[in-house]
Amino acid sequence: MDLRFLASLTLLLGLFFVNTNPTGGQVGVCYGRNGNNLPSPAETIALFKQKNIQRVRLYSPDHDVLAALRGSNIEVTLGLPNSYLQSVASSQSQANAWVQTYVMNYANGVRFRYISVGNEVKISDSYAQFLVPAMENIDRAVLAAGLGGRIKVSTSVDMGVLRESYPPSKGSFRGDVMVVMEPIIRFLVSKNSPLLLNLYTYFSYAGNVGQIRLDYALFTAPSGIVSDPPRSYQNLFDAMLDAMYSALEKSGGASLEIVVAETGWPTGGGTDTNIENARIYNNNLIKHVKNGTPKRPGKEIETYLFAIYDENQKPTPPYVEKFWGLFYPNKQPKYDINFY
């Protein structure tokens, strides 16, 4: 075969693989399934591909969804639900079985990126004591399966773990959560895994109307709103994220990266919830996360929008929980949004 042809083919293949791998700032989408009117998993994954959504977060494993993801080249964050924490923490064989069933059986065709062990586990939850042991057992199972270089194990927290968040440099964890956060941080540092953070400027804004400006929450403020020398903050997203980084730095986690595993703006059910505000927030977010925060400028922020669809069976209150979808159940977009 002509060596020049081989060289050209190699170059083309190299370009193909470079162009189909998501960058750090490529925004993914959360795929929740609490609805009785949603498209099938196969239709949904086809929608992801059509819209160039290259990463997905799943809150629990589902064989139909995982089968639909085979060969899609979409990177997957797979959730281990809170209800599994005790059994997985108490038995390495249970952890091994979970990884075999939901990861190994699909690993040849599905690009697993993270396993989120638990989601927003509260210190008051009866299963909180099992969180870190479950993370450790799942990590051992991943390593035993030979996937340690491919899949990072972490957990998802929300901003409620912070005692202070204003100004961002004052960010610190609540004293009562440290019994769980300290071992989480030690584990993540030892594994070079990121912390997954569910971050909603909407809830901060809606809970403090009159104190937090809407344009600050939507990335539309014309100039800096919060001064935190030597930094200035023009949007609430950066301020919240840097507050979490500040808390990590004070607790042995200065080396950790944060993945924003959920964010978005609802289109109904609450204060200033409408299609226009959701369009503004999500489109501005997609552009913004390529640039980093004042504390970590130039560092792309891996981020996941919540969510692909409205979910009419989400437990309420608050009623706003039902209205976070980017698309209607008929797969039509609520508003223009560009993932390219």
Curated annotation (Swiss-Prot):
InterPro entries to which the protein is assigned, alphabetical: Glyco_hydro_17, Glyco_hydro_17_plant, Glycoside_hydrolase_SF
Any Gene Ontology CC annotation: extracellular region
Keywords for the protein's UniProt record, in alphabetical order: Glycosidase, Hydrolase, Plant defense, Secreted, Signal
Domain of life: Eukaryota
Segment forming the signal sequence: 1-25
Intrachain S-S bonds: none
Broad class of enzyme this protein falls into: hydrolase
Keyword rRNA processing attributed: no
Matches recorded under Gene3D superfamilies: Glycosidases (3.20.20.80)
Pfam families: Glyco_hydro_17 (PF00332)
GO terms (BP aspect): carbohydrate metabolic process; defense response
Function in brief: May play a role in plant defense against pathogens.
UniProt record similarity statement: Belongs to the glycosyl hydrolase 17 family.
The protein, known as: Probable glucan endo-1,3-beta-glucosidase BG1
